[in-house]
């Protein structure tokens, strides 16, 4: 494009701040939201009074990658696999506290689902960002945490972290040694997350088409695809219609997961 691309991070409130910003953007502008399911699915299910409507206030553009979080612990934790972790957690008098990047996030839901399925006392501690949770875990304030695969791989390479299991439908190519929850016998962990782009509502078709075309070309670039894989996401190019269809398919599945996990917005 002939215009500079400016990335403006807006962390906090489980993505609500960032998503709401787009609803106040001029529909003719080139400001879009790069997000994950939490802003449009998880928040919509858990919070009845969102400042935005996840469908009416946005224009779907494209999904560019799919993946999921993994359960991690300090390298010196007294367990080396998920079964040992569960046994340790059940024996802990006060339970184990874990950190995620927000209430209602996929990591939070999977943590609550694991708690339900194992009977272990797992206590959720939400943070504004993944790194803050990991810092507290390394400092001893948390017993374990969830991590995006790219973060986990870097910390594992540095000898600071061990990964016990990953969500999603298959093992990750960047960490093939880490088993999925599904293959370990747990149900409900096979929902893939995604990275998607949304524009504001009523975005002109020409602007929408320009964005979709650009995202399609960029995602197909070998270096971009490799970067997505390094982050633990499988590259994917979807049309706006396919994105909307994926949303309609994932919403009820996530609602059921939230119900099974007993997760609430705290």
Task: Please describe what each predicted stretch is.
Residues 2-20:
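Early extracytoplasmic/lumenal segment of secretory-pathway proteins
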Residues 4-6, 97, 121-123, 162, ...:
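Conserved beta-strand segments of alpha/beta enzyme cores
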Residues 9-11, 35-36, 101, 127-128, ...:
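Active-site-proximal beta-strand/loop segments in catalytic clefts of secreted hydrolases
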Residues 17-27, 113, 117, 131-141, ...:
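Short helices/loops that flank or line small-molecule/ion binding pockets
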Residues 21-31, 41, 45-132, 144, ...:
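Hinge/capping helix and adjacent helix->loop/strand transition within the periplasmic-binding protein
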Residues 29-35, 143-147, 163-165, 254-255:
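Paired acidic/hydrophobic, glycine-rich loop segments that form the ligand-binding mouth/hinge
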Residues 39-49, 115-117, 144-178:
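A ligand-binding cleft/hinge motif common to bilobed small-molecule-binding domains
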Residues 117, 183, 205-266:
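An extracytoplasmic/periplasmic, membrane-proximal ligand-sensing/linker region
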